[in-house]
Amino acid sequence: RSLDWDPTIKLQRYNVRSNVDLKLSPTTQVRFNIGGYLQDRNSSPESTDQIFSRAFRFTPFMFPVRYSSGEIPAWQEEGNPWAMATQRGFARSSASKIETLFSLEQDLKFLTPGLKLRGTFSFDRYSTGKVTRSKTVEYWNAASGRNEEGELILAQKQQGSNFLGTSKSAEYGNKSIYMEASLNYDRTFVDKHAVSAMLLFNRRHYDDGSALPYRNQGLAGRASYTYNGKYVAEFNFGYNGTENFAKGKRYGFFPSAAVGWIVSEEPFMQPLRNTISKLKLRASYGQVGN
């Protein structure tokens, strides 16, 4: 019944977060992160935008919140902001989310110095539900003054109901799974030759309750060489794919290359070190796409 509901805006939320780093061995590190929340919200079935848009249209003295006899007034077809906020019923929603991440890093220096292997796995999930129960508010307008007993003469503008109507529910959720593995190499030889390389594979699967699920994955690589901290050459590539395209056209190869010159490291720039601390010239060319 209408006496059993509460339109007051209330919010309760519980958060949890835990980050754990473990060093299993001198060359092996593991990280596990988990976070999430539980949330419950109670409010009026009318949106905040609707309530405030009506309130901004009326001056405070245009009509009372209630007539002296208890009836609720309304102005033309606009309704009554107070009644919209307190007399229409209630909406209750709940939401929950969990985010997890697991990563592993293995130093492969026993094979060759500067070589590392990394892996990451994450799983996220979100869900929400909402139940709305509402009724029609009974509105009255002042007709013509007062009767012989001094009571206001009112005319019914809109017939209301005493009970909340059938509930309307809405549910939504999504989940995401992400995986990544990379092999990294970073080493400097005889203090002049800096070599770095990276090879990375990733995959993401996303399932949304309001759309078709999709998945994409790719392979990326990078190799760079720096001589004496001044001359740089770099090559990158991406081989990316998605199931959004037809078979045979789901993958694309996107390479790029660049060369650079760190002018500020040259001997003739040293007198200007305090004025120009970093000056670099770079030229690159690459291909991008979807």
Model-predicted segments: where are they?
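Flexible loop and strand-edge segments within Gram-negative outer membrane beta-barrel domains
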Residues: 1, 7-9, 13-79, 89-97, ...
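Flexible, surface-exposed loop regions and adjacent strand-edge segments
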Residues: 7-12, 47-57, 133-143, 149-152, ...
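Residues that define the transmembrane beta-barrel architecture of outer-membrane proteins
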Residues: 10-14, 94-100, 175-179, 215-219, ...
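Residues on the lipid-exposed face of transmembrane beta-strands in outer-membrane beta-barrel proteins
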Residues: 18-22, 100-106, 181-185, 221-227, ...
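Short loop/turn motifs that connect adjacent beta-strands in outer-membrane beta-barrel proteins
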Residues: 27, 107-117, 130-132, 188-195, ...
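Transmembrane beta-strands of outer-membrane beta-barrel proteins
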Residues: 30-34, 115-121, 195-199, 233-235, ...
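Transmembrane beta-strands of outer-membrane beta-barrel pores
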Residues: 36-42, 99, 121-129, 201-209, ...
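Outer-membrane beta-barrel transmembrane domain signature of Gram-negative proteins
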Residues: 62-73, 133-237, 242-246
